[in-house]
C-alpha cells in the first residue's frame, strides 16, 4: 500500500501495483484507493487541489516523470473547466457507476488510458505549451525543465506512434 504519513512522493513511488487492488471503470481508468478520504466529495465547479506523482507505463529511461512534492507546488484547477485531462477529472468526481468520487485526504493510484489523457497534444505538438492552455497536469517547464522535457517526449510527440498510459498517484486535499 501507499503509506500515508510523511513524504507523499517517496512513499507513493515505493508502493507497487501488486500491493493495491485495482478496479476498472467503464471508461477504462484503472484505479485503487490506498487511503479512502473523509468528508464531502468535490463537485463540478469546485476547486480541486492535489499532490501527484506522475509516471508512465512505457518509457525507456525509467517510469517516473514528475512529482508536485519536489517543488512543493500542489496542482489546482476548477473542476469541469476543461483545464485538466478527462481521466483525472473522472477520478476526482467519479463516473456515477463503479468509479467512486475521491474524498479529501484520499490517496488513489490511477492508470489513465491514452484516450482520456494527452492524445490531442501528440496530434499537434504546438498546443503543448502551458501558456497555450494545454490540459494539465503538466510539469512546469521553467521550474522542472528536465521533467517537462521527459513528459513532452513521451506524451506530446507527434512522431511517437504509441502513447503509453499515464500513472498518477494522487492525494486530494480539502479546502486549502
Regions flagged by a language model, labelled:
Residues 56-163, 168:
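A beta-strand/beta-hairpin structural motif
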Residues 170-176:
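Short beta-strand-to-coil "C-cap" segments at the C-terminal boundary of structured domains/repeats
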Amino acid at each position: 500500500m501507499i503509506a500515508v504519513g510523511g513524504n507523499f512522493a517517496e512513499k507513493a513511488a515505493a508502493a507497487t501495483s501488486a500491493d493495491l487492488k485495482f478496479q476498472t471503470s467503464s471508461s477504462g481508468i484503472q484505479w485503487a484507493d490506498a487511503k479512502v478520504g473523509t468528508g464531502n466529495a468535490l463537485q463540478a465547479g469546485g476547486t480541486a487541489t492535489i499532490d501527484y506523482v506522475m509516471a508512465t507505463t512505457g518509457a525507456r529511461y525509467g517510469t517516473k516523470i514528475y512529482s508536485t512534492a519536489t517543488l512543493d507546488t500542489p496542482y489546482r484547477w476548477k473542476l469541469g473547466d476543461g483545464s485538466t485531462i478527462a481521466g483525472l477529472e473522472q477520478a476526482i468526481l467519479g463516473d456515477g457507476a463503479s468509479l467512486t468520487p475521491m474524498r479529501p485526504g484520499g490517496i488513489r493510484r490511477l492508470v489513465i488510458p491514452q484516450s482520456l489523457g494527452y492524445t490531442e497534444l501528440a496530434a499537434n505538438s504546438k498546443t503543448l505549451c502551458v501558456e497555450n492552455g494545454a490540459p494539465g497536469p503538466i510539469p512546469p517547464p521553467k521550474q522542472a525543465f528536465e521533467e517537462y522535457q521527459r513528459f513532452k517526449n513521451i506524451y506530446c510527440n507527434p512522431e511517437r506512434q504509441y502513447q503509453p498510459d499515464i500513472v498518477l498517484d494522487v492525494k486530494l486535499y480539502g479546502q486549502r
